[in-house]
Amino acid sequence: MPTIVWTKIDEAPALASYSLLPIVEGFLDGSGIDITTSDISLAGRILAQFPDRLNEDQKVADHLAELGELTGSPDANIIKLPNISASVPQLKAAIAELQSQGYELPDFPDKPSTDEEREIAARYATVLGSAVNPVLRQGNSDRRAPTAVKAYAKAHPHRMGQWTDQVKARVAHMDHGDFFDHEESFVSRGQDLDVVLIGTDGSETTLASGIKTLDGEIVDATFMSVDALDEFYASSLAQANEEDLLWSVHLKATMMKVSDPVLFGHAVRTFLVDVFDKYGDDLNSVGVNPDLGLGDLYTRLEKLPAERAAAIKAAIDFAFAARPALAMVDSDNGITNLHAGNLVIIDASMPTVVRDSGCMWNAEGKRQETLACIPDRSYATMYAAIMDDCREHGALDPATMGDVPNVGLMAQKAEEYGSHPTTFIVPHDGRVEVRCGDEVLTNQQVEAGDVWRMSRVRDIPVRDWVRLAIERARITNTPAVFWLDKNRAHDARVIEKVKAYLPEHEGLDIRILAPADAMKFTLARIRRGEDTISVTGNVLRDYLTDVFPILEIGTSAKMLSVVPLLAGGGLFETGAGGSAPKHVAQFVAEDYLRWDSLGEFCALGACLEHIDQTSEGTKAGILAATLDKAIGAFLENDRSPARKLGQSDNRGSHYWLARYWASELAAQHDDAELADRFSDVATELAAREDQILKELNGVQGSPVDMGGYYHPDEELVAEAMRPSTTFNAIIESL
């Protein structure tokens, strides 16, 4: 029997699953399809790392490893919801919560100095950053807006800020010393590689050894000069001050868990350079690490004598007065862009800047134009191209915009998103060599503090990526653009492979353009209402599948993301919009969850279609077809969660999905048994509408006790997310 694995994850989508999953289980019962769950939440992954410290009844299996093995099976059917990519502050908060619940976990060691602390740090490192996606994404990505979602967005266009040629907001990026500048690339002959740092005194330090590569694998080596980075930040601060722009920094300190926290920390240090220069000894004495942001710094100041802490706070206030205004995350509570590295994440933040006329929030809670700092040129230029296009041609129009689906190269930890184990903060001056035996393959002069990294992409994923791009171009009769820059070392190697693997494609419009040029070409087509497939590497896959959905349909959470696994199974991801902690905060405060589960609905439909194509003896095809019609009715009748208390929230939207789906199943003529089974259910759901909605909406307005944030009490949350006894009884009758 085919089995769907529904992932247990974090925050808003986790809460929504307590309501939605029982409905899905009821509808699939007796269909020849089983459904089970797998815990890959942050708390679950933490507990799985410490079985030796837990009681028998506290131990948790390593579900992520189990799912990783499952991706190698042709029978895999995994619905993967958004999970937390944990920053260090989030990890510490989750550990503290679990400790308070009686789990004897060790503290996270900030600066491990003993073998035991280093071993603990290594275990915790496995759950930091994007620990889940590289394990599960054993295939390339086919991500697009469902037809019904795109049609709804055109009929009900979301708000877009206005653009004129007077808008000063822009992107600032480095022009030397960045990852783009230093990149070297070669194609492996299946060698085992070592990474060695040779000091100025000739001493050798092995940073990594025995790195096994496959024949035809592209290997890159590059580094970020932190001196050049500091120079860039200082220059951009001066520009922002001069032009009265907000200063903002856009990185991905969650996914790029080794490199980007350091880049973020240099932004903090540069902004407060006088404070760190004058009070460095005091700050070091209480363990201040700028990589953790201003929030952590303020917390640690409380450990200093009151007089000393007050002097430092005064110096910080003086720096804020002298610097350009900082972009704010929470103006009411004084939370800035620099408070923590996970608060402003580039793939979500930059599309919002474009949508909001180049603005972010200032300390007064008003929108103000920003200088958006994106240090590395590898991807910054395409964001600059969007803002330049809007400045020249005005805001994009969601009512007429074309569509930009994406085919993304991500299988087998492709490119930068798989580079964490081979990313290093250089401990001293010297040169870093990548060697195979005595053969030196790359050689780069570095200085202490520079961020050096090796990225890789194997040949089979590239072949499959090209195949998938051509397949989507043929099916949709849409131009496909490979976003590759011949002047970037890595991209030049990929271009060689793309040209070698492109099959005969007469009648198809296939292009290879640098990211900025690809963006200009795509935007010109979008403005004419024309569709264009973006074919990108792993990072641009992530960025573009937020940029275009947010501009086209107002959110990336409603995207359909299908990952045809290389082994033949399917991974179905629900949206690209993260796990929405603000939604959880509202739920806890007033029992109202505005998370939109449309992404889950669409992923379930795609999964059922896949099962129908790969398995016999199930009712998956009929379930998928009727679910698709139900989603259409759901959108046409505007049943997504409202944003105001007293109206239907996430739970109410699940009622409407169940009602429309049951109605479609009862009305179809392909399976009499299903029609008969859902006839009474459809009738009951319609007849009890008023009672069900009264029970669902009546609980709103009061605080909710979840019994925990990262590791909530399941009974408490289930009770809160299923408050309608009438609705529950109908679903349980299935």
Listing of model-derived features with the role each one plays in the protein:
Residues 2-265, 274-497, 501-661, 688, ...:
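Extended, well-ordered protein cores
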Residues 666-669:
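Ligand-binding pocket scaffold of soluble enzyme catalytic domains
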Residues 675-683:
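Short, charged, amphipathic alpha-helical segments
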Residues 683-684, 690:
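Short, well-ordered surface patches within globular domains
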Residues 693-710:
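A glycine-biased, small/acidic residue-tolerant capping/turn segment at secondary-structure junctions
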Residues 712-734:
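C-terminal accessory extensions/subdomains outside the catalytic/core fold
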